[in-house]
Design a protein with these regions (language model features):
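Amphipathic alpha-helical coiled-coil/rod segments that serve as protein-protein coupling scaffolds
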Residues: 3, 7-13, 25-156, 169-171
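Active-site-adjacent helical/loop segments in soluble small-molecule enzymes
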Residues: 16
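Short coil/turn motifs at secondary-structure junctions
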Residues: 21-23
Length: 171
């Protein structure tokens, strides 16, 4: 037997996971039934691209109610302003008491506060409606999609709707 030098390649196999530097778990900010899944597993997405749509009907109704409440509060404020102005003139002519004037002023202040509250509720309703469209926060690749159309989701679901992995920088 002769021994001679030869070139050999030694290979080793290791299990590993390649991940993007940034993995973003996607959770909904509002609850409801998934009405549309706009992506597939492994699809590349851009920042701001729609991933999911949650049932918008209850949120649209809440917005309409909030808008109506703002209009109602505006009307109440206008009435309270007229009442106060009227009482103020009558008070100057000693027709009504200081108590009546103070009551009208307090009603005016309450109407202003109700309008501010109604406007805040409208902003909240608009935000909630916008949250029904779940968008990608960054460029990347969509991970697994454990939820399908018809699934009931909320901000407290145990598993994210998906994960968007930024794969421009891997490790």
């Amino acid at each position: 037997m002769t021994v001679s030098p030869t070139d050999r390649m030694i290979s080793s196999a290791y299990s590993a996971t390649i991940r993007g530097r940034q993995d973003i778990d996607i959770y909904p900010q509002v609850g409801g039934m998934l009405t549309k899944v706009s992506v597939t597993e492994g699809q590349r997405v851009k920042s701001g691209q729609t991933l999911f749509i949650i049932d918008q009907v209850p949120y649209e109704a809440a917005l309409q109610t909030a808008v109506a409440n703002v209009e109602s509060a505006k009307a109440s404020l206008a009435t309270a302003q007229l009442t106060y102005d009227s009482k103020e003139e009558l008070y100057k002519e000693n027709v009504v008491s200081a108590f009546d004037l103070s009551t009208a002023k307090n009603s005016l202040l309450a109407a202003k506060a109700q309008l501010a509250q109604a406007k805040a509720q409208e902003v909240s309703a608009r935000n909630n409606l916008s949250y029904t469209v779940v968008k990608s926060p960054a460029d990347g690749v969509v991970g697994t999609l454990p939820y399908r159309v018809g699934a009931l989701v909320s901000s407290s679901i145990p598993e994210p709707l998906t994960t968007v992995s930024g794969n421009s920088d891997m490790y």
